Amino acid sequence: KDAAFVTEVESKIEKKLTKINSKKKKASGSFVYEFLLWDDKVFTKKSPTTFKKLTFNKEENISKVMKRVQRSSTKKKKTFKSFSFIAEYENNIPIELFIEQDKDKKDFEKAEQEALLFAIMYGQMPNFLKTYNKKIYVHNDVEFDDGLGTWWVMYQKKEFHINSPKINKKQACAKIGRYSNCAVVMAHELAHVIQQLTGVISPSKWKKAIKLDKKKYCSKYAKKNSREDFAESITCWIAARYKSDKIKKSDLAKFNEFIPNRLKFFDEMNFNMYPL
């Protein structure tokens, strides 16, 4: 009796595991990347940039700005002291950067280095993504993080926020191994800005493209909701059309197989892609 019971239990477990593995296989067959362009060096510090110069503006107190960290879903407002910089780009595109000051030390040189890092990276984005955004906030709510930290866009704001991890109090995004990942996330956040504010994107045409791609996605994260799908898809399109030599041929083939209608949608927008 005991042997029969054990056999029955093992059979049920085996069936359940088979079902779970089947679901996992099916799910992984619906997207190209689990983590978008993670192993690809799509951007480097030497990638073309439209950045011209960085100018210190002033010290400024910032109030009622959202505080976010990787391991907490709590959304609190905060006030902090910052160094404000103005970055200038070709085609008369300016951006204001606010670098949060360290609480224990007012280190202007460190803040300037951070501002320069992200200002140059911003210049590597295609012009159509730079046109509408006006501000970048670089936060200092540091906690242990082995990834890229927390990046976000506030609803109906022409700005985005970076709370990336530090290594020995220096920006992790400055490391060669993480630079491209950070630049990819920057493109993703700027895609949120253009989708929610500009009226450039036709919601009906975008929904049609999604429907035609029949529940296939660029990345696993794109499946979260329509906003993340848009941001991930436009980043994949940039990689597929303008950085194809930086990604695997097999992944490029999957782009064309999984999201051809999304790619076509962006192709037909005739965006200003300079300096890519």
Predicted regions and their residues:
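Soluble non-cytosolic domains of exported or imported proteins
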Residues: 108-116, 177-181, 185, 221-225
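Auxiliary, metal-adjacent structural segments of Zn-dependent hydrolase domains
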Residues: 31, 47-49, 58-73, 77-165
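Solvent-exposed loop/turn segments at secondary-structure junctions
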Residues: 142-145, 167-169, 200-201, 237-238
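N-terminal module-boundary/linker segments of secreted carbohydrate-active enzymes
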Residues: 2-79
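A structural motif
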Residues: 154-156, 195-210
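Active-site recognition of the HExxH zinc-binding catalytic motif
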Residues: 184-199, 231
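Short pre-active-site segment immediately N-terminal to the catalytic Zn-binding motif
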Residues: 164-186
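Metalloprotease/metallohydrolase-associated module, dominated by Zn2+-dependent proteases
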Residues: 209-276
